[in-house]
Amino acid sequence: MTTFFLNRLATEPHALAFAGQSTPWPVALADQTTDPSLDEALRGHVAAANRLLAPVAADLLATTGRPVDLFGFTPNPARLGAAADATASVEGVALTQLGALLDLEHLGYSVAQAKPLAVLGHSQGVLAVHMARAIEAAGSIEAAGKTLDEILAVAALIGAAGTRRVRELGLSPKYGEASPMLSVKGATREQVEALVKRVNNARGPISIAVTNSDNHHVLSGYPEDLAALALEAEREHKHQAKLREQKLHGGTVFNPTLEYLEVTLPFHSPLMAEAVEQTVSWAGACGFDQDRTRALAEEVLLNHVDWNARVKALFNAADPAKLWIVDLGPGNTLGKLIGNVVQGTGIGVVEATTLSERSTLSTLESEPERTQNWKAFAPRVINTPAGAKLVTKFSKLTGKPPVLLPGMTPTTVEPEIVAAAANAGYWAELAGGGQVTAEVFDRHIAALEDELEEGRTVEFNAMFMDRYLWNLQFGSSRIVPKKRASG
C-alpha cells in the first residue's frame, strides 16, 4: 500500500519549524488566499481577533493611525516595504503560519494526531509554536479556535506595544541604510562582542538578539549604533588585511557579511522591556490569559534566541538520519538557517512554505532529499585475524593503513625513509622534486631496490612547476616511465 510523505510523518520522527521577522509574509498570505476555503478561514480568524481587541481598540488606533488590513499589502518577495511595520508584520507572520497549519490539515496532516517531536519557532515564530501546541491540546484546529484567535490578537498587541515604545525612545526605524536589527555572518560571538565594545557614545544597548549558528549572530539596538558597529567591522577588516599584506599576521582576514533586517523594532532587546508590560496591560483589559501573553511578549520582544542550540537539541531527541524538519515559513530563509546548523547530520530539511510545496508532499511517494550524513565517511574499526584494523576510503582503495609518507622535498628525496615506511606496510612516496638528474634518480632507485622487501611498492610524487624536471622525468627523457617499465 502506498503511503504519501505527508501521511508518513505521523509515524516518523519529525519537527515543524516556523520563521520570524523580516520574512515575506504578504507573499505567503497572497498564496494562501488563492484557496477559497483557506481565504475564508483566515479572514474569519482575523475578524475574531479584532473583536477580542475591542476594549483597547482606541489605544491601538492611536498607535497605528488607521485600521490595519493584513490582506491589503502588495506581495513582493524582494522587499517588505510597508508590510515590515511591526503593527502589521507580527500578526501577519503569525497569520500565515496559522494558514500553513490549516492547509496541512486540509491535506491530511493533523498536528494533534501526528504529534511532532518538536515545534521550533525562530524569533517570533514562537507564536506559531503556541498555536501548534494549542491545537495538540485541544485535539483539532476547530477545537482550538478561541485560543488561536487570542494568540493572533496578542500578536497584534505585541506589534503595537513595540511600536509605541520605540516612539517613546525616539528610535527611528531607519538611519540611512541601517535598521534596528543587523545580521553579522562570519564572526564568532567573541568577535561580535568585541565590536560592540568599540562603539563609543552608543544611544542604547547593543544586544545579541539571535544566535543562528556558531558564526552567525543578529544584533538589536538603535540603528545609528548598529551603523557605528558596521564601521568598526570595516575598520577591523582593513586593519587585518594590512597586517596580512605586510606578512605580520596569518590566517583568515576578518570579513563578516553584514545585512540589515527589514524590521521596525529592535526585537529581543532590553529596549523592549516596557513594551512587554504594555502588552500584558492591554491583554488584561481584553480578558486574555496574562501569563501566556507575558511569555509570548518576552519571547518576541525581550529574550535572546539561541536558534543554534534549539536545533542541535533535536540531535539527541532522535536519530538525525531518520529525522525530518519541515519548514512552514513564511519564505525559505529559515530552511537555509536550519541547513547551516544540521549539515553533515543526515537530517532532512523539507520546504513546505507554499500551497504548491505542501500539495506536492501530500502526494509524494518517495523521500525528499536529506542532508549528507558525514558519519558515512567516518573510519571504522574491524577485527581481523591479524588484529583490529582501521577501515577508511583510503584503506579500501589502496589496501594499506590510512597513514601515508608524502613525497616532500627534501625529506623523502633519499630512499631510506621511503623504503622503511613501505616495508612497514604504509603508502610511501619518493619526492620527485629532488630527483634533479638521471644519475641522482638512478642512484636512489638502486638503493630502493636493495632495501625494499619483495612485493613492496613506492609511489613517485611529482609537481611539474618547471620545464626541466618535466622533460627529465616524463617528457623527452622519460626516466620515470622507463624505470617503471623495467620493473
Question: What is the role of each PLM region?
Answer:
Residues M131-A295, E299:
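Alpha/beta catalytic cores of group-transfer enzymes, especially the acyltransferase/condensing modules
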Residues F18-W25, A187-E190, T409-T411:
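Short polar catalytic/cofactor-binding loops
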Residues N7-A10, V111-Q113, P173-G176, N200-N201, ...:
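Solvent-exposed alpha-helices and their adjacent loops that cap or buttress functional pockets
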Residues P368-G487:
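Active-site entrance/lid segments in N-terminal catalytic domains of soluble metabolic enzymes
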